[in-house]
Swiss-Prot record:
Gene Ontology cellular component annotations, sorted alphabetically: small ribosomal subunit
Organism expressing this protein natively: Mesoplasma florum (strain ATCC 33453 / NBRC 100688 / NCTC 11704 / L1)
Gene from which the chain derives: rpsE
Region of interest: Disordered: 1-42
Subunit structure: Part of the 30S ribosomal subunit. Contacts proteins S4 and S8.
A biological process term (GO) from this entry: translation
Protein keywords: Ribonucleoprotein, Ribosomal protein, RNA-binding, rRNA-binding
Protein name: Small ribosomal subunit protein uS5
Cited function: With S4 and S12 plays an important role in translational accuracy. Located at the back of the 30S subunit body where it stabilizes the conformation of the head with respect to the body.
Length: 206
């Protein structure tokens, strides 16, 4: 009995000397999942062109890479960005960051655009026309990337000027940014409703 009591007393003494460990709940330390975190994931990106540029200095030639990227959420938002860096991935990263700063809102009418428009930039001109459902995107080159990432599923697009990729993209974005909603097009076409006012009656003098 004496041995048992000594063991129990010793265990109690050890438990009293050891400090209590605090249990920390790690859940509050997690970052709140807000809409800003998912906003970046909603955007898709397409690399249009990557070219090597040369800068001649007194020390010699310096080679860098220039990337042109289009981003969009396929819900009416699209943007263009360019970036330069010594490595291709870094140039693409800079272009994507710039494209997200240059987003524009494109008014959609179902799966197509509200009306016909011609976008201009430099020597580039792009004609954009609405199409019936099921037509698809009839466009080529860089303009197709912009239209698809904007969320337009049925449309006609044709280049009327130079086929420089950057000029075509900027001309397409210029055309999409000048689009009006269906209601505004209706107001511009037929005019605002006219409110009829009755003329005041004038009593005839005998």
């Amino acid at each position: 009995m004496e041995n048992k009591t000594e063991v129990v007393v010793a265990e109690n003494a050890n438990n009293q000397t050891q400090p209590e460990r605090k249990k920390f709940d790690r859940k509050p330390n997690r970052r709140p999942q807000g809409p800003k975190q998912f906003q970046k994931d909603d955007f898709e990106e397409k690399v249009v062109t990557i070219r090597r540029v040369t800068k001649v200095t007194k020390g010699g030639r310096h080679f860098r890479f220039a990337a042109v990227v289009v981003v969009g959420d396929k819900k009416g938002q699209v943007g263009l960005g360019t970036g330069k860096a010594n490595e291709v991935p870094e140039a693409i990263k800079k272009a994507v960051k710039e494209a997200k700063k240059n987003l524009i809102r494109v008014p959609l009418r179902g799966t197509t655009v509200p009306h016909e428009v011609i976008g201009h930039f430099g020597a580039g001109q792009v004609l954009i026309k609405p199409a019936k459902p099921g037509t698809g995107v009839i466009a080529g080159g860089p303009a197709r990337a912009v239209i698809e990432l904007a969320g337009i599923a049925d449309v006609y697009a044709k280049s009327l000027g130079r086929n420089n990729p950057i000029n075509m993209i900027r001309a397409t974005i210029d055309g999409l940014s000048s689009m009006h909603t269906a209601k505004k097009v209706n107001d511009l076409r037929f005019g605002k409703p006219v409110i009829k006012t009755e003329k005041p009656k004038v009593e005839e003098t005998k």
